Amino acid sequence: MDDSQWVSIHIRDRLAQGNITIRESFLYEGQFHSPEDEKKALTEDDIDQLIIPSEGIGEVCARGRRGSEGWMDLFDGEKKICELHWDNRTKRPSNEFEVIDGDKDYKIECSGWSPQAGPLGHVFIDISAAKKKAAAAAAAK
């Protein structure tokens, strides 16, 4: 498979407790593959079995001759953290990566990807607990 259109999503669990899991992953174009071996294809079911432990990192990779478009939901137990969506198909003038429906109880940071047409590259997603406004106000006194 042509490796010119690829994305590698690094999800870091910075929560003090619990695991982050992936659900409802879907790839419209392209193919998921193992981070260790791009020739080893993975299914959406394989991606949905990924468990990222507290203070750990999980990696989801996809590529395709004409790029890929996909999405996945991140969960903390039964609570949805957010949805991740990307699109780096070759017919688009630019790349897109977005965090959708982020839960206010989590701080979700996204960095590293290329908005220019071509490979999305490495995307870094850091998930931590959001600071509560009341706790921040009390600490400021």
Swiss-Prot record:
Entry GO terms, CC: cytoplasm
Principal location: cytoplasm
InterPro entries referenced in this protein's UniProt entry, alphabetically: Aegerolysin-typ
Annotated GO biological process: symbiont-mediated hemolysis of host erythrocyte
Location relative to the cell: Cytoplasm
Keyword terms of this UniProt record: Cytolysis, Cytoplasm, Hemolysis
Function: Hemolysins are potential virulence factors. Has hemolytic activity against sheep erythrocytes in vitro.
Family from the record: Belongs to the aegerolysin family.
Protein name as annotated: Terrelysin
